[in-house]
């Protein structure tokens, strides 16, 4: 069911970079192969004073609470993860299928996740600040990586997804300006997950959350997994709701004000 829309999307993307097509790179010696076409460049974004902030963290780390806290701020747009799409692709639920049998459905889900997150990154930005729940970067560096490391994704699937991801990085603007990492103990996430009782999450074991936490630490804290796409602001997120809201308020300027983002990973 996913192949037809993906073929159409791929054909459209590739046509954008054919010589002679609108937005295609110039041909000839010394010409650059990569051109971002309709998507704004980093310099254009800086000129327009628009920024993209991604809230990253484990399952049940408090990302939704963070997004809701800042959603009423002036001139900010919030993009949540397109979970409803992952639960219903023309009547199919690839998210639920993946949690039931990751070896069989991991590639199916992550291919669609990569597509839908690309759509999130490249849709027109109307506000000065865009706050996103996760990113195409964590989809690849955390969740695809976990499937592969755990032996639930064959190497050929991993390589194909990685090739798609690398092509996207080279040819499209999925850059971000700040990562807010809600650093949460896996046990805390597990208890929250059980309390909120989402259908697909009922089968998630603590070991899975521990693996996801470990990859976040490698990527965003140690910097030993993959390149970090932006400066990282770490917020310890094991606290109760009232304390988390206080921490969000304390970090408001560091999150929303561009000149306060020179944080480093």
Swiss-Prot record:
The keyword Nucleotide-binding applies. Pfam families: dNK (PF01712). One of its GO terms (biological process) is carbohydrate derivative metabolic process. It is found in: Mitochondrion. ATP binds at residues 57-65. The keyword Cell inner membrane does not apply. The active site is at residue 133. Residues 21-31 have a biased composition (Low complexity). The gene is TK2. It comes from Macaca fascicularis. This is Thymidine kinase 2, mitochondrial. Residues 1-33 form a transit peptide. Its EC number is 2.7.1.21, 2.7.1.74, 2.7.1.-.
């Amino acid at each position: 069911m996913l192949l037809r829309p993906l073929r159409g999307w791929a054909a459209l993307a590739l046509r954008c970079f054919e010589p002679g097509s609108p937005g295609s790179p110039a041909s000839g010696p010394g010409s650059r192969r990569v051109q971002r076409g309709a998507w704004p460049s980093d310099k254009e974004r800086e000129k327009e004073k628009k920024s993209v902030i991604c809230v990253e963290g484990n399952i049940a780390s408090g990302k939704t609470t963070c997004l809701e806290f800042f959603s009423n701020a002036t001139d900010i747009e919030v993009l949540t993860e397109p979970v409803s799409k992952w639960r219903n692709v023309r009547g199919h639920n690839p998210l639920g299928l993946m949690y039931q049998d990751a070896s069989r459905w991991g590639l199916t889900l992550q291919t669609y996740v990569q597509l839908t997150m690309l759509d999130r990154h490249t849709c027109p930005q109307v506000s000065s600040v865009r706050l996103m729940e996760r990113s195409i970067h964590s989809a690849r560096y955390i969740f695809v990586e976990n499937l592969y490391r755990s032996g639930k994704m064959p190497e050929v699937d991993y390589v194909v997804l990685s090739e798609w991801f690398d092509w996207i990085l080279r040819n499209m603007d999925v850059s971000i300006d700040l990562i807010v990492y809600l650093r949460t103990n896996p046990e805390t996430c597990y208890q929250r997950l059980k309390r909120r009782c989402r259908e697909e999450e009922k089968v998630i074991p603590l070991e899975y959350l521990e693996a996801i936490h470990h990859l976040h630490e490698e990527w965003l804290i140690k910097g030993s997994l993959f390149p970090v796409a932006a400066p990282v602001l770490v917020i310890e997120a094991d606290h109760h709701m009232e304390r988390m809201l206080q921490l969000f308020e304390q970090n408001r300027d560091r999150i929303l004000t561009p000149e306060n983002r020179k944080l480093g990973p």
